[in-house]
Design a protein with these regions (language model features):
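Short secondary-structure boundary segments
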Residues: 144-146, 171-174
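Active-site acidic carboxylates
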Residues: 2-93, 109, 139, 151, ...
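A contiguous pocket-lining binding segment that forms or flanks enzyme active sites
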Residues: 114-166
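Glycine-rich phosphate-binding loop signature in dinucleotide/nucleotide-binding domains
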Residues: 107-113
Length: 212
């Protein structure tokens, strides 16, 4: 079988490494420890897999924290910080990252119109940024198994609110497949297989499941 010619990666209606940016927002100890919509360990592992995936495909990352400079919050958890390798994340005081000038400038500077969103909590930091980005004409893709809320109901409400406004929810595995698209693109196959295999083995070894 012969693959079709590669579509224009900048104009493709699907997510590509060339037309997307990844927003990692508020993955800090307080936010993670107060998630109640799914198992916190599983959530963090999914976020790690998501970050590893976008880094493997060279997707630009905009990394932001809240209230670290003020001393009220701790920085991004090391499991993610060491993957992002960003020594100077954009620290805000705003709950809505889209109301922070430097954050919005950084997103615009990527030149990408498809935004992959991984933020805590779903009902606040994810939802507010998604709604504002959608209003400005961006396409927004919340990674549903790598975001979490203060309750299952809050998570669902935040996600539903953004979907009704036009957000397109994805899982981290579907994101990986969309970035890869063709097994004949051999350069990134080893990373994809390693990330997915590592994730599966970790889940099997701990047998942690999220609530339905």
């Amino acid at each position: 079988m012969t693959s079709q010619a590669v579509r224009d990666p900048f104009a493709d209606h699907l997510i590509t490494p060339q037309n997307s940016a990844f927003l990692l927002i508020d993955w800090q100890p307080t936010q993670i420890s107060t998630v109640r919509s799914m198992n916190q360990d599983l959530l963090l592992r999914n976020a790690v897999s998501t970050v590893r995936t976008v880094k493997a495909y060279g997707v630009p990352v905009v990394h932001s924290t809240v209230n670290v400079a003020s001393g009220q919050q701790q920085p991004t958890v090391p499991e993610l910080a060491e993957l992002v390798q960003d020594d100077d994340p954009l620290d805000r005081t705003t709950m809505n990252s889209w109301e922070d000038v430097q954050f919005v400038d950084a997103v615009r500077a990527t030149g990408r119109r498809k935004l992959i969103l991984c933020a805590l909590w779903t009902e606040i930091c994810m939802a507010f940024a998604a709604l504002d980005a959608l209003r400005e004409g961006y396409e927004v893709y919340p990674v549903v198994d790598a975001i979490g809320g203060t309750s299952l109901e809050a998570h669902r409400a935040g996600l539903q609110r953004t979907v009704r406004a036009g957000a397109q929810p994805i899982s981290w595995v579907s994101l990986a497949g969309e970035l890869q698209r063709d097994w004949a693109r051999l350069e990134t196959v080893p990373a994809l297989v390693e990330i997915v295999l590592t994730d599966r083995l970790l889940k099997e070894s701990t047998e942690v499941e999220a609530p339905v």
